[in-house]
């Protein structure tokens, strides 16, 4: 009955008179017919300069196929059509929309991104069921006040427009959860924004903001706040009261001081690189109990406090391009997976150690803690034993640091004496890197109940044997610079593995078994011959945050990879694909993922 009521008062001959002629070839009748069944219509990338009238009237006019069959017994019952709920008209040449938009009151999704729109019609207020509105990549200078009538709106994407201010009454969008205002010309954020109490994600990056309102702390559900690339000189202390905040991006601003976060106990990532921060103190660190990523690159830091050891959960620390001359040795006791130090005038760590990577730097710092302990004469007897090969195994490292280290010996096998030295001690890390190993040492199996980190990089491994696959507590595995072209399916049993480094090997595809290790957070597989990845399987890897595919043979990047929204670092340089263009890659992971998502066919 609702359908008959809707067309009451309309010219019932409208569908016969204009239904087909108005659309011409721009919208095939078959597409409209399918849309009446599914409630979804995708007209993206059709070079449209205006929306055909038959689209606005899809649920009003009698369809053309009614000419051929008016029988109530027909299989195709056009009068039982579904209201259009999803309309995608992105990637066209639209300069305006008409008020006929009101003829689609059932819309829940309207996607008109990547057009040439300078305004939105006031009739948009009548789309009261709208939940997602994407108007990004247009030329909007202002938003109509009527947009505040969309009380069911949950996602609003306005990035890459020419907005200079926010409409009055914007705070009435009380159900809004995801708001993207990045890449506009905003100079202020109204205090009334704080009334957006349902907001979970707010992107204000690449604007001209000089300050944030103190009232921002009322956004009690906000988890993701991106203020990169603005003109912020200070952060309101009230921001420290945002108890749900997990990700905070403040890169490329003019901050001179790092804010304190006494109530942000859930904060996992803090990005404050490319500012003018001169000092890092204990007060800045002591409340960051959950922090996993701390980005302080390109600032003016001169030192790192000993209290850095308080960040027990820290995994990635970027200190590159500062004025740091020394590091606290206690930094070596953190379980970092990534430590960037380039561009600092460090006097206490040789450049060759830094060039060997994170684990070598941490190992060096730990060794300096040891050097500050027993005297040299004591350590000669306590920390090493001589093997038949005249090499030494560091007993002190086994006992105090729980590391079995037999690296940089150019050995073709690991002597039994190395494993014998463990005795009844607990060992959590194995470092057999920089040798000539052609196979996994079989006696590693003896340590399967305790080892979490294994470094077998810079060897001559051409296959992985089952000895490695039984290390069920393994969280970190470094296999770079070997001769590997595959991984065994049995590696699926490594149910705690978080980081794997396969760079500089001979892989032609991402090993299938990796898609089934759902605990993986970091995959480094640069400098191989990888020709493809499976975005559908990768989307299932919900913990994956870092994927390095640089310098491979990728001829194309599947748009569906953009759905891997948990990725924080996606590196694609040095591949032969043409799109995304280099300019997109330079904008970083978020821009790459957005670019890919915008090109997913629907």
UniProtKB/Swiss-Prot annotation:
InterPro entries for this protein: Leu-rich_rpt, Leu-rich_rpt_typical-subtyp, LRR_dom_sf, SLRP
Signal peptide: which range, if any?
none
- The protein's name in its UniProt record: Leucine-rich repeat-containing protein 40
A GO term from the CC aspect: membrane
Q: Which organism does this record belong to?
A: Homo sapiens
Q: What biological-process GO terms show up in the record?
A: intracellular signal transduction
Q: What PANTHER family does the record tag this protein with?
A: AGAP008170-PA (PTHR45712), INSULIN-LIKE GROWTH FACTOR-BINDING PROTEIN COMPLEX ACID LABILE SUBUNIT (PTHR45712:SF22)
Residues with Phosphoserine modification? 71
Tell me which Pfam families the record gives.
LRR_8
> Which keywords are on file for this protein?
Leucine-rich repeat, Phosphoprotein, Repeat
Q: Where are the LRR repeats?
A: 83-104, 106-127, 129-150, 152-173, 175-196, 198-219, 221-242, 244-265, 266-286, 290-311, 313-335, 336-356, 400-421, 426-447, 450-472, 473-494, 496-517, 519-540, 543-564, 566-586
Keyword Phosphoprotein in annotation: yes
Q: Which gene encodes it?
A: LRRC40
């Amino acid at each position: 009955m609702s359908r008959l009521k809707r067309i009451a008062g309309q010219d019932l001959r409208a569908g016969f008179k204009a239904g087909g002629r108005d659309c011409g070839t721009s919208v095939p009748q078959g597409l409209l017919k399918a849309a009446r069944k599914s409630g979804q219509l995708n007209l993206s990338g059709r070079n449209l300069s205006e929306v055909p009238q038959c689209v606005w009237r899809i649920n009003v006019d009698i369809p053309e196929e009614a000419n051929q069959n008016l029988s109530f017994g027909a299989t195709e019952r056009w009068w039982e059509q579904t209201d259009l709920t999803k309309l995608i008209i992105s990637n066209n040449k639209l300069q305006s929309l008409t008020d006929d938009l009101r003829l689609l009151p059932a819309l829940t999704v309207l996607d008109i991104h990547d057009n040439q729109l300078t305004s939105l019609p006031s009739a948009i207020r009548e789309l009261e069921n709208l939940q997602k509105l994407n108007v990004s990549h247009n030329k909007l200078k202002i938003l109509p006040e009527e947009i505040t009538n969309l009380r069911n709106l949950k996602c609003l994407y306005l990035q890459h427009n020419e907005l200079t201010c926010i409409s009055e009454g914007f705070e009435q969008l009380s159900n809004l959860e995801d708001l993207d205002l990045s890449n506009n010309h905003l100079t202020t954020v109204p205090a009334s924004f704080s009334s957006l109490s349902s907001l979970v994600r707010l992107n204000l990056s690449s604007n001209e903001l000089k300050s944030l309102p103190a009232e921002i702390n009322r956004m009690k559900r906000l988890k993701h706040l991106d203020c990169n690339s603005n003109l912020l000189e200070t952060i309101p202390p009230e921001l420290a009261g945002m108890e749900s905040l997990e990700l905070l991006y403040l890169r490329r601003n003019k901050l001179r001081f790092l804010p304190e976060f006494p109530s942000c106990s859930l904060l996992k990532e803090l990005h404050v690189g490319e500012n003018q921060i001169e000092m890092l103190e204990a007060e800045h660190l002591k409340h960051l109990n959950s922090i996993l990523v701390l980005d302080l690159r390109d600032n003016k830091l001169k030192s790192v406090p000993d209290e850095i050891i308080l960040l027990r959960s820290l995994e990635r620390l970027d200190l590159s391009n500062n004025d740091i001359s020394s590091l606290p040795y206690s930094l070596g006791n953190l379980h970092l997976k990534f430590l960037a130090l380039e561009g600092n005038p460090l006097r206490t760590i040789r450049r060759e150690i830094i060039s060997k990577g994170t684990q070598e730097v941490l190992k060096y710092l730990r060794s300096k803690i040891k050097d500050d302990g027993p005297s040299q004469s004591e350590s000669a007897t306590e920390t090493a034993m001589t093997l038949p090969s005249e090499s030494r195994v560091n007993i002190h490292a086994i006992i105090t640091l729980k590391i079995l280290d037999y690296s940089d010996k150019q050995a073709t096998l690991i002597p039994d004496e190395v494993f014998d030295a463990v005795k009844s001690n607990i060992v959590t890390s194995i470092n057999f890197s920089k040798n000539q190993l052609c196979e996994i040492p079989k006696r590693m199996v003896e340590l399967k109940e305790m080892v979490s980190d294994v470094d077998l990089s810079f060897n001559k491994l051409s296959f992985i044997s089952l000895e490695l696959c039984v290390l069920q507590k393994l969280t970190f595995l470094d296999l770079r610079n070997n001769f590997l072209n595959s991984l065994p399916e049995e590696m699926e049993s490594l149910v705690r593995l978080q980081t794997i480094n396969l760079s500089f090997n001979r892989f032609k595809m991402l090993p299938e078994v990796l898609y089934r290790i759902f605990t993986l957070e970091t995959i480094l597989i640069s400098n191989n011959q990888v020709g493809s990845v499976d975005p559908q399987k990768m989307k299932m890897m919900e913990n994956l945050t870092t994927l390095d595919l640089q310098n491979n043979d990728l001829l194309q990047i599947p748009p569906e990879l953009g759905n891997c929204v948990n990725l924080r670092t996606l590196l694609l340089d040095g591949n032969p694909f043409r799109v995304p263009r280099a300019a997109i890659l330079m904008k970083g992971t978020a821009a790459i993922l957005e670019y890919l998502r915008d090109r997913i066919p629907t």
